[in-house]
Curated annotation (Swiss-Prot):
Organism: Escherichia coli (strain K12)
Parts of the chain on the Periplasmic side: 1-12, 59-68, 114-120, 173-369, 428-430, 480-481
Name the record gives this protein: p-hydroxybenzoic acid efflux pump subunit AaeB
Membrane-spanning segments: 13-33, 38-58, 69-89, 93-113, 121-141, 152-172, 370-390, 407-427, 431-451, 459-479, 482-502
GO biological process: carboxylic acid transport
């Protein structure tokens, strides 16, 4: 496909984006808004931003959800801006500096919350800054400006949603159904690989792919939940399927690890059974029926616990899968599965990374303020706004530097494009609303196609072009003002990029170490006799951390294997029949406290000391288990855990 070619699948969204822009423009001028540009810009960003993130036409509900987040972020930002202005109106410089800190604070929060919700916090940060900067000449008009900005943004969002509904958005339901079938086949094939006990790298690749696919399925569930309330039953089932899929991965990998020391546990009966190849979900269904008969014939005691647990989880997965596809009423058997254990939320491992993002945003905004005050440039305020926008939105993404480059390319492309609209097109179409709408629709259509291709600079060009062309009421054409705005955008993006380069993010290794220690803490916390604690479902949170580790350290197999081993240890110890008595319960609490100290330690020396203490406590704990005559189901996994921690103690403690 050529660089300027138009694929059929891109046309519908391009028309949708053009419609959203035209609707926002028409409504803005019809209701005599002072700056219809904000409504048009909001409609374009909400629609195009979702498509850029999806790499194509977004699924149904995605634009609506992003618009909802934008409304929340705008209202939080407006309220914060009003509070800052009321409190510090007599000290303008201090007021702007506090706004810079507020933008950094919002970026810090957005780095810690779920990535889907981070958009609202990033927006709240720079909205307050926009209000404070814009009202500098006339501070008494602050409430009016805040209300107008909120109104224009809500109009833009409503227009984007209307355009999305008008062109029948894609439903993700069929994709979910297909992925459920395919994922079950992949789970069976992983178990086959693990029972064969072949090449470790092949097994690593297989389970790594399944972790990514299960995480992607969880993302699809979020999209389906946003799409319509009629998928509420499917959403409940998919939430349980996520845990079941992770359980299948864990049991398969434990089957592989067990054979490293005790290959005789997997009998020839099961080896021969899993030799049969499967291609479709129907093949898996037949094999599972046969496997349940084999287990009933051999007996539960003669069946390896990992295979028995795997079959139970696969059977539940199959039952819920049928319910998701048909979206029928939840029956009693399904309800029993869905009334599972409560999921545990873990503390973010990216706190240091979040603090780096805070300083990047705060320092870049302060640098913009100093540049504005030093030069006295009329568009210094525009440069400040772009600095806040770039740093607030870029920091949460995996590669902030590339986001800043995208904005630089976009603002550079917006200069000639905006010049064409400012000097030629808009002056010749302002007498006709129809011609003005057509001219902006053409802009939205072609940039909408490029946005779906994730063309570098396309998203920045769309937003920057709309921002600098005259879409005010009434329209005024001052070339110096246009040029100042265009150059202000470019300078702001360059300054933001400079700060991102200068303030290095060296938090990757620290985040990796914290993640690994959180896996250790989870495995230690599984050693408990507390019934409520044993019922807690840590699996989704643990695999979410594993997925983050895989993204932070692509290709680092030793780290992935260590993390997976800790997850397996957690699951095995969680189900182990630990003797119930006060002596062991008190020691469990002591080990949990020590594991927490390992995570929270700020220096390598403290971390090594607490980790050494944890290893000593594990030795004492094993002795206590022997005294209390704990069965092998308890002593063996504890011994394996202690051995793993001894082996990898340097990786878990040293910076």
């Amino acid at each position: 496909m050529g660089i300027f070619s138009i694929a059929n699948q891109h046309i519908r969204f391009a028309v949708k984006l053009a419609t959203a822009i035209v609707l926002a423009l028409f409504v803005g001028f019809h209701f005599q808004l002072e700056t219809p540009r904000w409504a048009v810009l909001t409609a374009a960003i909400v629609a195009a931003g979702t498509a850029f993130a999806a790499g194509g036409e977004p699924y149904s509900g995605a634009i609506r959800y992003r618009g909802f987040l934008r409304i929340i972020g705008t209202f939080i930002g407006c309220i914060a801006g009003l509070v800052i202005i009321i409190a510090m109106i007599r000290a303008p410089l201090l007021m702007i500096l506090v706004c810079c800190i507020w933008a950094g604070f919002c970026t810090w929060i957005s780095s810690l919350v779920r990535i889907e919700n981070s958009y609202a916090w990033g927006l709240a940060g720079y909205t307050a800054l926009i209000i404070v900067i814009t009202i500098q000449p006339e501070p008494l008009l602050t409430p009016q400006f805040a209300v107008e900005r909120c109104s224009e943004i809500v109009i833009g969002i409503v227009c984007a949603i209307m355009a999305d509904l008008l062109f029948s958005p894609r439903s993700i339901k069929q994709e979910v159904d297909r992925e459920l079938e395919s994922l079950l086949v992949a789970q069976y094939q992983l178990m086959q690989l693990c029972i064969k006990h072949g090449d470790g790298e092949v097994v690593d690749k297989a389970w790594g792919d399944l972790v990514r696919r299960t995480t992607a399925l969880q993302g699809m569930r979020s999209n389906l939940n946003m799409e319509s309330s009629r998928w509420a039953r499917a959403n409940r089932r998919l939430k349980a399927i996520n845990t079941l899929s992770l359980t299948l991965i864990t049991q398969s990998c434990e089957t592989y690890l067990i054979q490293n020391t005790r290959p005789e546990l997997i009998t020839d009966t099961f080896r021969e059974f899993f030799d049969t190849p499967v291609e479709t979900a129907q093949d898996v269904h037949k094999q599972l029926k046969r496997l349940r008969r084999v287990i009933a014939w051999t007996g539960e005691r003669e069946t390896p616990v990992t295979i028995y647990s795997w079959v139970a989880a696969a059977t539940r997965y199959q039952l819920l899968k049928r319910g998701v596809i048909s979206n029928t009423k939840i029956n009693a058997t399904e309800e029993e599965i869905l009334q599972g254990e409560p999921e545990v939320k873990v503390e973010s491992a990216e706190r240091h990374h979040a603090m780096v993002n805070f300083w990047r945003t705060t320092l870049s905004c302060i640098l913009g303020t100093l540049f504005w005050l030093w030069t006295g440039w009329t568009s210094g305020s525009g440069a400040m706004v772009m600095i806040a926008v770039v740093t607030s939105l870029a920091m949460r993404l995996p590669n902030p530097r590339m986001v800043a480059i995208d904005f630089i390319y976009g603002t550079l492309a917006a200069l000639p494009l905006g010049l064409l609209y400012f000097l030629v097109i808009i002056p010749n179409t302002q007498q006709s609303m129809l011609l003005l709408c057509i001219s902006l629709a053409v802009l939205g259509f072609f940039l909408g196609i490029e946005v779906q291709k994730r063309r570098l600079g396309s998203m920045g060009a769309l937003a920057s072009t709309i921002n600098i062309i005259v879409l005010d009421n009434p329209m005024t054409f001052h070339f110096s003002q246009f040029l100042d705005s265009a150059l202000g955008q470019i300078v702001g993006c360059v300054l933001a990029f400079t700060v991102i380069l200068l303030v290095r993010d060296k938090s990757r290794d620290r985040t990796g170490r914290v993640l690994l220690n959180q896996f250790v803490s989870a495995a230690v916390s599984a050693m408990t006799t507390n019934v409520a604690r044993r019922k807690e479902n840590h699996l989704p949170a643990l695999y979410q951390q594993l997925f983050l580790l895989m993204n932070k350290f692509p290709g680092d197999l030793p780290k992935f294997r260590l993390a997976l081993t800790m997850i397996i240890a957690h699951q095995r110890l969680r189900d182990a029949p630990i003797p119930v008595n006060e002596d062991l319960s008190a020691f469990h609490r002591q080990m949990r406290r020590t594991a927490d100290h390992v995570i929270s330690a700020r220096s390598d020396d403290k971390r090594r000391r607490y980790f050494g203490q944890l290893l000593e406590e594990l030795e004492i704990y094993q002795e206590k288990l022997r005294i209390w005559q704990a069965p092998p189901q308890v002593t063996e996994p504890v011994n394996r855990l202690a051995g793993m921690l001894h082996k990898y103690q340097h990786a878990l403690t040293d910076s």
